[in-house]
Regions:
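Ligand-binding "clamshell"
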Residues: 122-138, 246-270
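Periplasmic-binding protein-like
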Residues: 162-181, 298-319
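N-terminal segment of the mature folded domain
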Residues: 19-169
Length: 448
């Protein structure tokens, strides 16, 4: 049974670092208290999601009267709350993803928040004191994040590549006529530097092509205001979270000439087929306290994932989507598209391996729970590969991975109707990059 907060109080080394939007409260901090948990790292995670998760988790444990106070820096907050008459605190610092690993290593944090995966160098530095942060017991994918690129409804443009986006927002392409549009200057609208939204765009688009945001871009502190500005200007283009598309047109995004442009929806972000999607993480050391481990487990639970949805991010709870035939796709693929539905998860693999990545291992458990509630339906697994190596070998590898997922399901009593391999066909990402190849190595899950 999970320990109570009172039991955790004995462990003074426990700490969590998170960043949040302060909730309304009149409570004042009158005493210096050692934080029960310290959560440090990503502003994208810390701004809204972390505070919501931590309050819900602590309330479940018996906490009440929550009050957030800003500390020395804007991104440093302290949560004060009461637990059975005792005053307790949680520390949340959101100075950026890299600080998650630095502060874990220097014992300034108990939990790290990150909007990117831990690097090999960070894993190596932390190995001796924190354990292997890349392993499933220490790495927790808590949400998915997607960015929509929006233009005015009257703009004829429908799709764009990430490279062209980088050239537009860096100012290299400055007129819509250069993209086959009207003879108008492109008006760039962007979120402010402190926003997780800009951080996402910067990492997935600008940095990818070694570009920087143009000085001519108008900056907004509010996604709502940015979206409204796009709707009022036929020459404008901007980027926002999925919840803020409003009256505008969202563009389909491709990663290159060989990939199909994909529109941003909660489904395409959930499957990670959409180019401007990314994973959000919590990291806990192997030696983390029971309370820290319980919090990470709560975040990835069905209840935690429902809270993810409420904050505007994309959860990993499974949803069903109707699929349509794709022009040029194999006939067998399109036959399934006519009669089946697709589930909002893809299983992905490390290069050259049949072993699921950490998200895949947890998604397997989610799929099993989903099928227990949909016991009359059957699954079809479709394997895909990157384009490195011979075509026949890639098709064989894609089949082997799909069969690896089948074995895991069948051994747990979940029936699989068919296993297919489409090899390197129908790529969702550019095979010229490591990240693109990783996204193409996937097993799609269909419901018949």
């Amino acid at each position: 049974e999970p320990p109570t907060l009172a039991a955790a109080e004995a462990d003074k080394d426990v700490a969590v670092a998170m960043v949040s939007e302060p909730s309304q409260s009149t409570a004042a901090v009158t005493a210096v208290v050692t934080p029960l948990i310290r959560i440090h790292g990503s502003n994208t995670v810390g701004e809204k999601l972390a505070p919501v998760l931590i309050e819900a988790f602590l309330a479940q444990q018996g906490g009440a009267e929550f009050s957030w106070q800003q500390q020395n820096a804007e991104v440093e907050r302290l949560l004060s709350f009461s637990d059975r008459g005792q005053h307790k605190q949680v520390q949340l610092h959101a100075h950026g993803s890299s600080t998650a690993f630095k502060d874990l290593l220097s014992n300034k944090a108990d939990i790290g928040m990150s909007s990117r995966r831990v690097t090999a160098d960070e894993v190596s530095k932390a190995q001796q004191t924190l354990g292997d942060l890349s392993k499933i017991g220490n790495e927790h994918i808590i949400a998915l994040d997607g960015l929509a690129i929006i233009v005015n409804q009257n703009n004829p443009l429908k799709a764009i590549s990430t490279e062209m986006l980088a050239r537009i927002f860096s100012g290299e392409i400055s007129r819509w006529s250069q993209l086959g549009g009207p003879e108008l200057p492109i008006v760039l609208l962007a979120r402010d530097n402190n926003s997780g939204t800009f951080d996402t765009f910067n990492s997935l688009v600008l940095k990818k092509y070694q570009k920087k945001l143009s000085d001519k871009a108008q900056r907004f502190e509010s996604s709502t205001d940015l979206s409204l500005a796009v709707s009022q200007d036929e020459a404008a283009i901007g980027f926002i979270g999925l919840n803020y598309i409003a009256y505008n047109k969202a563009l389909a995004i491709s990663e290159g000439a060989d990939t199909t442009p994909i529109y941003p929806t909660r489904f395409t972000v959930s499957t990670e087929d959409y180019a401007l999607s990314r994973r959000l993480y919590l990291y806990t050391p192997t030696s983390a306290s029971q309370l820290a481990k319980d919090f990470a487990q709560f975040a990835i639970s069905e209840q935690g994932q429902e809270l993810v949805e409420q904050t505007g991010l994309v959860s990993q709870n499974i949803r069903i989507e109707k699929v349509f035939p794709i022009e040029g796709a194999p006939a067998s693929y399109n036959q399934y598209a006519q009669s089946g539905q697709r589930l909002s998860l893809n299983f992905r693999f490390n290069y050259g391996e049949n072993d699921l990545d950490n998200k895949g291992k947890r998604d397997l458990e989610r799929l099993i729970r989903f099928m227990e509630q949909n016991s009359g339906r059957r699954l079809v697994l479709m394997g895909f590969s990157d384009s490195v190596g011979a075509v026949a070998k890639n098709a064989e590898l894609a089949l082997r991975r799909a069969k690896a997922v089948e074995r895991e399901l069948v051994s747990r009593g979940i029936p699989v109707l068919a296993v297919e391999s489409f090899g390197e066909l129908l790529p969702v990402a550019n095979n010229d990059t490591d990240a693109g190849r990783e996204r193409n190595r996937r097993v799609e899950v269909w419901l018949i």
